[in-house]
Swiss-Prot record:
Domain description: Has the structural arrangement of an alpha-helix connected to antiparallel beta-sheets by disulfide bonds (CS-alpha/beta).
Classification via Gene3D superfamilies: Knottin, scorpion toxin-like
Disulfide bond keyword on record: yes
Role of this protein: Binds voltage-independently at site-3 of voltage-gated sodium channels (Nav) and inhibits the inactivation of the activated channels, thereby blocking neuronal transmission.
UniProt record similarity statement: Belongs to the long (4 C-C) scorpion toxin superfamily. Sodium channel inhibitor family. Alpha subfamily.
UniProt subcellular location: Secreted
Alphabetical GO biological process terms: defense response
Native organism: Lychas mucronatus (Chinese swimming scorpion)
Alphabetical list of Pfam families matching this protein: Toxin_3
Protein name per Swiss-Prot or TrEMBL: Neurotoxin LmNaTx21.1
Domain spans labelled LCN-type CS-alpha/beta: 16-76
Domain of life: Eukaryota
This protein's GO CC annotations: extracellular region
Disulphide connectivity of cysteines: 26-75, 30-51, 37-58, 41-60
């Protein structure tokens, strides 16, 4: 029982959602192009992606835990 609880708490293949960023900490602008965002997200190992209307930036779902997403900090590009 303890082993099962430990396995459930440790996330071996965690997934997260968010705005992926490039090496300059900048989000990917998409101009309402869902296909472009889907491609970016799949290349980063995500399950799906789309162009988020309000930010006009790509939003990914199911990204691996090691992929950087937009947090704090300014775009340096």
């Amino acid at each position: 029982l303890i082993l099962v609880a430990c396995l459930m708490m440790s996330c071996v293949h965690c997934k997260k959602d968010g705005y992926p960023v490039d090496w300059n900490n900048c989000m990917y602008d998409c101009g309402y192009d869902n296909a472009y965002c889907e491609k970016i997200c799949k290349e980063k190992g995500g399950e799906s992606g789309y162009c988020y209307f309000w930010k006009i930036s790509c939003y990914c779902e199911g990204l691996p835990d090691n992929v950087e997403i937009k947090g704090y900090g300014r775009c340096r590009g």
